Amino acid sequence: VANNLKLEDINLDDSPAEVGEEACDLGRRIPEWKKTLALVVAANYRCGAYTSYSNNGRTVVFVGEGEDSVVASCCFRASANAAENCFRTYCVRMKALGYGNVSRQKGVKGTWMLGFISGLKRAYAEQVSNDESMALAIVVPESVNRHMDGIGLRTTKIKVRTTSDPYVKADGYESGYGFGRGDRVTAASA
């Protein structure tokens, strides 16, 4: 739904499409908020997502029909980079206002990122509500659900360290909502 996709851009024929996986390398340590972001992006691009752990590092794997998994992976990378850039801008702004180095305070980054993800999720939901024909187009296909069930994944709880400051989450929310609506996000803006 993001990036102004139209119903004509999505293939709705009944022939069974091949389910594919696209891995996105995350390095050795995965911030918990990235797992949440991956799930939100995957749902918006007709995909499922899971995290894979190995000795070489961690990956998030997007599972979708056709090119859906590749598109979801690219969108995830762009969203994660935008979130990091916006958070850095937020930290610079808070330091200029005399709040010190907020990036080192416990829970601030997790809270801000959860706000960003909530804003992004709302922007995606608004795009669907503005064009109700898209609601059916972004439903995760049954073949993807069967593939995800067949993998035999263990579920774990995502635990993001947060702070109780509502202003931190609100700032992240506004940045995520703006990014989801297509506003240009750079390291200098936000």
Give residue spans per PLM region.
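Extended, helix-rich structural scaffolds rather than catalytic motifs
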Residues: 4-190
